[in-house]
Amino acid sequence: MAMIEFLLAGIPLLLLVLAIVQLSLLWAGKSAVDTAAHLASRKFARVARADFRRAREIAFLEAFQVCRNRPGGSFGSAAMTSLDVTKDGERGANRADAGEALCVRLTHGVELVVPWIDRFLFALSPGKKIRLGDHYYLMMQSTRWVTVE
């Protein structure tokens, strides 16, 4: 009887611990996306007035490297990184003047890696998400407004 009680109590406790681990990894992933967006937007703001296209490339490369080198990052998840630059959050921009404010939006896929919990969180997530085979990704976004130097 004690063994059955242990199993009945142990399974939910195991699932709770796994959920806490996965949520901690998601929190770390979101923090890495926020950091990548901040660093990318700073690099973009410095170069955008002289060469807008090159500034976007430099900012994307910075975001790509930060997302790839984050804990749990990989080339696979970094490949799901996009960087959008807009004037008002909606319309695309293709040039920038000094003092102009632009919106830099970074989107990055963070993989759900904890077994059993990955499917559950993937189903519950209301945001953008992608499933590739047996891998589940939540698309984390971070937005920064920058003033072109």
List PLM regions with ranges.
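Alpha-helical assembly-interface signal, strongest on the long, hydrophobic N-terminal helix that forms
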Residues: M1-Q65
